[in-house]
């Protein structure tokens, strides 16, 4: 294995504290470190929703502080073609996609990695809270040490070959430790708030953003019995398990329990709702997934006992995974709430992230009980 002092590493600098500390730690470990700030969205309305200029200034301040060069690259065209158009297509089809997962696969671990290698880098590094392990000729993706910050869910579609060319310096740390290091070295990002939400939406209301690209198609809101109790502005604005923004209230003979989105009937353009956080239609026993990406090849010649997450920050859920003619079927030991088509299911074997795919359909718990 090459000594760090002979290896050139380019760190993806986002202007946040995690990538800042990643660059600092790699320097301390003896690597030849440079930074790269990538711009993935071109603001066309003059209001700088993505705060790209502020983030670039913060990244530059950190690089100046620790004495490394900062490259810049614009991957907006790649982002539009490989992430954003898919994002719109999924919403148009009535599903709820996760663009961060595609961004990691197509931009950070493809466009950025390729560009860094073209600059002469041996490796790249990011501020993700994950770890890697080289074992038996392959590179595994492991959960980050901090369970509150583990980001393996978002990196499940990145292949082992890409993981093998990446360092994750903060994956072995907990978030408070990272902030403490940034403060100790007086980095400009030490107290910077973590970014939330999707870059290209920024602080705008999601519905306002989506209206710019997709025409709204209003339709009926129905109960599970087929009673029309309201109107929706477009199925794309709603997701399974949603409670807020339905505009339902004051119905005769209805209880005071809150209403939740249970289903989206795409054929009829109808939103199906029900009352109560424990409504049986909210819970699923099994799901079918497609577009599966494995970090490394996985043997599913027979059903396999694993754990899974159907959303970020969910605790590990025991399941049995099997390959079928129609995709991959996961059957859970316990009912899963608000399993959402378009979102990702990610599979684990202990601390190893095996990979995952897109949820196509969910089998309701009550259907299984019949």
Curated annotation (Swiss-Prot):
Active-site residues annotated for this sequence: 103 (nucleophile), 199 (cysteine persulfide intermediate)
Pfam entry (one): tRNA_Me_trans_C
Site entry: Interaction with tRNA: 128, 343
InterPro entries linked to this entry: MnmA-like, MnmA-like_C, MnmA-like_central, MnmA-like_central_sf, Rossmann-like_a/b/a_fold
Residues the record lists as binding ATP: 12-19, 38, 127
Coiled coil: none
Span list, region Interaction with tRNA: 149-151, 311-312
Keyword terms, alphabetized: ATP-binding, Cytoplasm, Disulfide bond, Nucleotide-binding, RNA-binding, Transferase, tRNA processing, tRNA-binding
Gene Ontology MF terms: ATP binding; tRNA binding; tRNA-uridine 2-sulfurtransferase activity
Gene3D superfamilies per UniProt: Adenine nucleotide alpha hydrolases-like domains, HUPs, Translation factors
Cysteines joined through disulfide linkages: 103-199
GO biological process: tRNA wobble position uridine thiolation
Catalytic activity, EC: 2.8.1.13
Compartment(s) of residence: Cytoplasm
Catalytic activity: S-sulfanyl-L-cysteinyl-[protein] + uridine(34) in tRNA + AH2 + ATP = 2-thiouridine(34) in tRNA + L-cysteinyl-[protein] + A + AMP + diphosphate + H(+)
Enzyme class: transferase
Keyword Translocase set for record: no
Interaction with target base in tRNA: region residues: 98-100
GO-annotated cellular components: cytoplasm
Tagged with keyword ATP-binding: yes
Function: Catalyzes the 2-thiolation of uridine at the wobble position (U34) of tRNA, leading to the formation of s(2)U34.
Protein family membership: Belongs to the MnmA/TRMU family.
UniProt protein name: tRNA-specific 2-thiouridylase MnmA
UniProt gene name: mnmA
